[in-house]
Amino acid sequence: ALREALRQLPERERQVIALRFYHGLTQQRAAGILHISQVQVSRLERRAVERLREWLAT
């Protein structure tokens, strides 16, 4: 179920989740890799986690 939900995420959100949770990077480090701000990583992460919670709850 989780794998399928991850596949449904927009690409950028999926990248953030992979870097943060699979690779254990900080938001700052993930931001550097993706060439975006730490604030943007935070927003993308929050959105992705909210989507995953919704999808996995149903």
Indicate residue ranges for each PLM-predicted region.
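Amphipathic alpha-helical segment used for protein-protein interaction
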Residues: 1-15
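Short alpha-helical "recognition helix" segments of helix-turn-helix
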Residues: 29-32
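Helix-turn-helix DNA-binding motif, specifically the short coil turn and the N-cap/start of the second
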Residues: 26, 36-40
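Residues within the DNA-recognition helix of helix-turn-helix
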Residues: 44-47
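A short pre-motif secondary-structure segment
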Residues: 16-20
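Short, locally clustered residues in the helix-turn-helix/winged-helix DNA-binding domain
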Residues: 7, 21-22, 53
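A short, glycine-centered helix-capping/turn motif at helix boundaries
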Residues: 10, 23-26
